[in-house]
Amino acid sequence: MMNRLINEQDGRNYSAKPDSSAAGSQENENTIELTVPDNLAGLRLDQALAQLLPQWSRSRLQGWIEQKCVSVDSAAATCKQKVWGGESIRVIAGQTENDQSHQAEAIPLKILFEDDHLIIIDKPAGLVVHPGNGNWHGTLLNALLNHAPQLSQVPRAGIVHRLDKDTTGLLVVAKTIEAQFDLARQLQQRTVKRHYLALVLGKLEKDGVVDAPIGRHPIHRTRMAVVQNGKPARTHYRVLEKFTASTLLHCSLETGRTHQIRVHLLSIGHPLAGDPVYGRTSPDPSTADAVVRLPRQALHAWQLELTHPHSGQILLWESPLPDDMAALLQAIRNLPHSSVSRPL
């Protein structure tokens, strides 16, 4: 586990000021001002905002427009009105009724770093990040509201990206709307570096890249799949350790689609060990007993690197393997066959 300063970008300001493609500023921590870039000309206002403010869902943005929290060139706006480039948009980023219904709950959190702008969480298995789909309580969002009550004023309690319920490891949370806006831009521009450790079934011989679009499974709507009309998704993987019937990988993301690593690795015939949804392939008998000991997918968000939204410093955190994955790997290493490893 570490919090390490890599370097400082001299003269670079990473506060919530969009770049030349969407120039803007923040009047206060609840107000965002943007200039519509020319490349969005012809879009509806809600469509343009969905691209400029990807940290918030389109339905949320539409709600703000309908509540008169969005103006275009100082005039009231509608969702359907077109933008043509150059307009000044002002957004008052308020709460929705759904935000206000979430309750603070005293759930322990493992916090690796916290200041006035960020919280870095080391998430355990079993913790849902955001309420929904039958998990309305006991989530990371509920825990954050208890830990830092001021997050009730930040949409989604500052959450800007997610991990699946049973994926462990590092998450960043923004403590202000300004920080949330900046972190979302970093994610959109793919400058946030997210690295994972994954144990997959079967032996992979070479490093590789999976570049395949991901969308809803055409039949099983609660699952994701590689589909032709899905959203672009790209996952890099590097072989760290090879066993007779499984492989330890270092995975890194260029995009952040739902279940991306799980779906991409399944698509190349190597599902995650223990995955209850995408790991339908039976493990090799030589490792079956060890894999069965892990009641979840063997996926850990090991490393997170980002630019601090206020100071401009590039920061890196690492999280050690959780006990269950470490025990699984040790059990496999103890089996009577050799492995080949290389350093991270």
UniProtKB/Swiss-Prot annotation:
**UniProt EC number:** 5.4.99.23
Q: Does the keyword RNA-binding apply?
A: yes
Respond yes or no to whether keyword Membrane is given for this record. Answer: no
Q: Which InterPro entries does its entry note?
A: PsdUridine_synth_cat_dom_sf, PsdUridine_synth_RluA-like_CS, PsdUridine_synth_RluC/D, PsdUridine_synth_RsuA/RluA, RluA_PseudoU_synthase, S4_RNA-bd_sf
Any GO MF annotation of the entry: 23S rRNA pseudouridine(1911/1915/1917) synthase activity
Name the catalysed reactions: uridine(1911/1915/1917) in 23S rRNA = pseudouridine(1911/1915/1917) in 23S rRNA
The protein here is known as Ribosomal large subunit pseudouridine synthase D
Localization recorded for this chain is:
Cytoplasm
Q: Which family does it belong to?
A: Belongs to the pseudouridine synthase RluA family.
The S4 RNA-binding domain covers 43-116
- A single Pfam family it belongs to is PseudoU_synth_2
What Gene3D superfamilies does the record tag this protein with?
Pseudouridine synthase, RNA-binding S4 domain
Q: From which source organism is this entry?
A: Nitrosomonas europaea (strain ATCC 19718 / CIP 103999 / KCTC 2705 / NBRC 14298)
Which GO terms of the cellular component aspect does the record hold? cytoplasm
Give the residue ranges for region: Disordered: 1-29
One GO BP annotation of this record:
enzyme-directed rRNA pseudouridine synthesis
Annotated active site: 164
Q: What keywords does the record list, in alphabetical order?
A: Cytoplasm, Isomerase, RNA-binding, rRNA processing
